[in-house]
């Protein structure tokens, strides 16, 4: 049976703003308090989705989350009607309201970890929503993420949904941003590579000193158990703590994979040679080669990789069998990075084409092309069981652009977050969106 990789991109929400909430993410910190343009951000994301669909890729849409997150404000003691709750929060702490108004669910690489049916002992696709324990503004996402995923992947014969891991540092989980799957055809067995930043139950191991390691080995191992993965086709690799301290807050800022190919920096992993030997051996056991494209420090520094999000790219297999790397405009603007990319596509590797997209609104908040998408490998039967209303086509692209034009602002500052009109505008937009995407009542205000 034929297999597909379906990319589900997050639609940017109407409260997209620059709050500098993500310590360890240098772009997020640098652009704190800048004016944002939610309408442009959403349209930039939609353009990428449509362009990839037009290339023949399977492309889906994940809905934004309700923000401001009034239920959490109520848990924190703010009372009255919803507009009063938001106003009180603004008076008490603009920073708290900003945190609970973040449009961070757009970065769906952190939404969940997904294991395809070919790898799972029960032959079903498994989803575990990420607890995103390391950052308060993201730790509130798991419940809505789970409900959105369940509305898209409903059929229990094909799909299994697990609760997020416990909300403690020991099980800090950042989802697919620290997870790669290598293999051949998307419908056949692969090798899953879980990347972690620290191991809580073994304090003797090296770890970062400046920035937090957001993913733990304990979390990755728990997900592998939940997803019923075979140990002989699963690898756990530690990210190099030195690059975490240089701003590589997720593995997808320093490495990306597709099928047999791993595209990564020279300093991406701790004990890199040993890790790749294990991956190579496990790939051989499923009859596949492991192709390592390693970018040396003397061609692209870690600092340049972080600044341009070279590795926060997408590698996509086209219908003709070749691979295209999708990079942000910032990669083209950096001479060293652009020179390397153009040399790479002449090297005879499977990657033979480059596509550049302007995602500046997301990039300024610290998220590139790979941050915006959740990869789901499906066979034909499973793809036919997906909610068809979320799959990108000409009609959905036009409808969502009109929806954005109708509901989104083109300028948003932090002080606008307490505007009662913004709350009501957003809720009206989300009510309409759930009908467009056929999601049902997934938002707290709809219940």
Curated annotation (Swiss-Prot):
Any one GO biological process: arginine catabolic process to glutamate
Short name of one Pfam family: AstB
Active-site residues, record numbering mapped to chain: 174, 250, 371
Catalytic function, reaction form: N(2)-succinyl-L-arginine + 2 H2O + 2 H(+) = N(2)-succinyl-L-ornithine + 2 NH4(+) + CO2
Pathways per UniProt: Amino-acid degradation; L-arginine degradation via AST pathway; L-glutamate and succinate from L-arginine: step 2/5
A GO term for molecular function: N-succinylarginine dihydrolase activity
Cited Gene3D superfamilies: Succinylarginine dihydrolase (3.75.10.20)
Enzyme Commission number(s) from the entry: 3.5.3.23
Highest rank taxon of the organism: Bacteria
Cleavable signal peptide: none
Record key words, sorted: Arginine metabolism, Hydrolase
Binding residue positions for substrate: 19-28, 110, 137-138, 214, 252, 365
UniProt family annotation: Belongs to the succinylarginine dihydrolase family.
NCBIfam families for this protein: arg_catab_astB, PRK13281.1
The protein's assembly and partners: Homodimer.
HAMAP family, alphabetized: AstB (MF_01172)
Its job: Catalyzes the hydrolysis of N(2)-succinylarginine into N(2)-succinylornithine, ammonia and CO(2).
Protein name listed in UniProt: N-succinylarginine dihydrolase
Gene source species: Acinetobacter baumannii (strain SDF)
């Amino acid at each position: 049976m034929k297999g597909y990789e379906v990319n589900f991109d997050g639609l940017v929400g109407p409260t997209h703003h620059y709050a500098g909430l993500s310590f360890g993410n240098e772009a997020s910190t640098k652009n704190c308090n800048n004016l944002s343009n939610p309408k442009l951000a959403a349209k930039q994301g939609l353009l990428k989705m449509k362009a990839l669909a037009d290339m023949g890729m399977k492309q889906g849409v994940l809905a934004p989350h309700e923000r401001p997150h009034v239920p959490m404000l109520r848990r924190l003691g703010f009372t009255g009607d919803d507009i009063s709750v938001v106003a009180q929060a603004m008076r008490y702490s603009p920073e708290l309201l900003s945190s609970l108004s973040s449009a961070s669910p757009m970065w769906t690489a952190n939404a969940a970890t997904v294991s395809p049916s070919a790898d799972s002992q029960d032959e079903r696709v498994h989803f575990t929503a990420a607890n995103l324990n390391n950052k308060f503004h993201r730790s509130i996402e798991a419940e809505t993420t789970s409900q959105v995923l369940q509305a898209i992947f409903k059929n229990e014969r094909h799909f299994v949904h697990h609760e997020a891991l416990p909300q403690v540092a020991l099980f800090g989980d950042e989802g697919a941003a620290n997870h790669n799957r290598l293999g051949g055809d998307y419908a056949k067995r692969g090798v899953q590579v879980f990347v972690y930043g620290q191991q809580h139950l073994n304090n003797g191991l090296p770890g970062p000193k400046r920035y937090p390691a957001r993913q733990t080995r304990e979390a990755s191992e728990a997900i592998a158990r939940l997803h019923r993965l075979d140990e002989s086709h699963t690898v756990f690799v530690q990210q190099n703590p030195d690059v975490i301290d240089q701003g590589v807050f997720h593995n997808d800022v320093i490495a990306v994979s597709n099928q047999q190919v791993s595209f990564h920096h020279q300093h991406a992993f701790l004990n890199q040679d040993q890790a790749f030997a294990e991956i190579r051996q496990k790939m051989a056991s499923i009859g596949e080669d492991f192709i390592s494209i390693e970018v040396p420090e003397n061609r692209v520094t870690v600092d340049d990789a972080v600044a341009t999000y070279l590795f926060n790219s997408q590698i996509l297999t086209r219908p003709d069998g070749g691979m295209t790397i999708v990079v942000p405009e910032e990669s083209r603007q950096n001479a060293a990075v652009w020179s390397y990319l153009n040399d790479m596509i002449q090297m005879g590797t499977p990657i033979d084409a480059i596509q550049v997209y302007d995602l500046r609104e997301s990039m300024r908040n610290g998220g590139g092309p790979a941050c915006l998408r959740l990869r789901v490998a499906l066979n034909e039967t499973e793809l036919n069981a997906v909610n068809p209303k979320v799959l990108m086509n000409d009609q959905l692209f036009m409808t969502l652009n009109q929806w954005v034009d109708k509901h989104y602002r083109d300028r948003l500052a932090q002080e606008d977050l307490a505007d009662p009109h913004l709350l009501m505008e957003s809720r009206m937009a989300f009510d309409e969106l759930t009908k467009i995407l056929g999601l049902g009542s997934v938002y707290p205000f709809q219940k």
